Amino acid sequence: MNPRRKQRLAVVGIIGFLIVSAVGLMLYALNDSIDLFYTPSEIIEGKNGQKPQIGQRLRIGGMVVPGSVSRDSESLAVSFDLIDTGPTVTVTYTGILPDLFREGQGIVATGVLTDVGAIKAQEVLAKHDEEYMPPELAEKMKGIKHVKPENMPTYESSNGAGSK
């Protein structure tokens, strides 16, 4: 092999190494911003045989379990349970919930898995249209009935106000 050919091969090798390194660094950087979508059943039982890791960022979608919303009177902290067709997952969130958030309504939350079955959400999005649902969630939630707000039971308060 002549010196000129060796020099070309070395240049091609260096360029190839730099391209592979750049792609590797981009994938590593993107890994922190990827949020995988899960349903409550997939968080508890695993998705394709793999459960999400504690501390992993993810998106979860499901229906808010009626009667599960608990608000802290001292702060904006709220916790609620999400369900699809199986087990429930508890979501905690500190902030102002969307206007369309209510029990029996579909939501998508973005956050971190803090424990098996527990999510600390940084963002909560409520479904805008009664008919729309993300395709991943729609597939998992076939057979769950949507609870309309006007059909939600209300309970008597201590001052006698209330209906139904």
Curated annotation (Swiss-Prot):
InterPro entries: CcmE, CcmE-like_sf, NA-bd_OB-fold. Heme binds at H128, Y132. It is found in: Cell inner membrane. GO terms for biological process: cytochrome complex assembly. The gene is ccmE. Belongs to the CcmE/CycJ family. One of its GO terms (cellular component) is plasma membrane. Keywords: Cell inner membrane, Cell membrane, Cytochrome c-type biogenesis, Heme, Iron, Membrane, Metal-binding, Signal-anchor, Transmembrane, Transmembrane helix. This is Cytochrome c-type biogenesis protein CcmE.
